[in-house]
Amino acid sequence: MRLIHVLKNNQEQATAAWIDHLKNLRIEDMIQQLARQDKNFENALQQLNELKIFIGDPEHILGSYLTKHGEIAEHVQVRFCNADKLLVGKAANHTFEGVGRTAMEDYLRNGKMIQSKFYNGVKGTFNAIVTHLKSYPYFIKKGGSYDIPRDQYESLIDIYNRGQTARSSLSRSEETLFKHMIAWENEQDVKICDVVHPTQVDYKDVQLKVVD
């Protein structure tokens, strides 16, 4: 009976020690996870601080007071996208590095050229894309694409889709824009959904009076 008692005590002690060991491992793992989360948050916050610094000096932003939103939109997109990536421990995938301030691209996403177009109204933004590609005919062929305001992208795609499936629902101005989109696709041998993408913000969100 004594031997059984000793063995039982030893087993209980071993079990308790193992539980303590698991607890310590869990605590250490939690500490490491929290440290990583803190670092991720710090990295993401740095991106937002860079944006704050840029917006905080309007005199150095290209354009007049009414057009500075174009360059603001570029920085908002780059910093917001990078912050989202960094917050979950992924690498930033947007950069201005190696891009001239007046180059045909505004920034790079995953190494690909991106031109940002933020005009007042979806028609104005689409026309700006058409004009840009006339100036740089090989932009798309070299892997480039366009970022436009989220709300305008939704309108553009809605008009495009209704033009394909419910043509009669289009207004006169929407019909004209739809025809221009189809003609542009045929001319460039592309699909709009492949080369035009939404940003994280709407047109109104990048106006200087809003973000200042």
Language-model-derived ranges and their functions:
Residues M1-A73:
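Interdomain/boundary linker segments immediately adjacent to catalytic/signaling cores
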Residues L45-N49, I55, R109-K112, T125-I129, ...:
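Generic hydrophobic, helix-prone segments enriched in Leu/Val/Ile
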Residues Q11-Q13, Q32-Q33, Q37, Q46-Q47, ...:
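Residue-identity detector for glutamine
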Residues R36-A44, E105, N110, F126-D151, ...:
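Long, charge-dense tracts
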Residues S135-D212:
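Metal-dependent nuclease catalytic core centered on acidic motifs
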Residues N49-K134:
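Catalytic centers of nucleases
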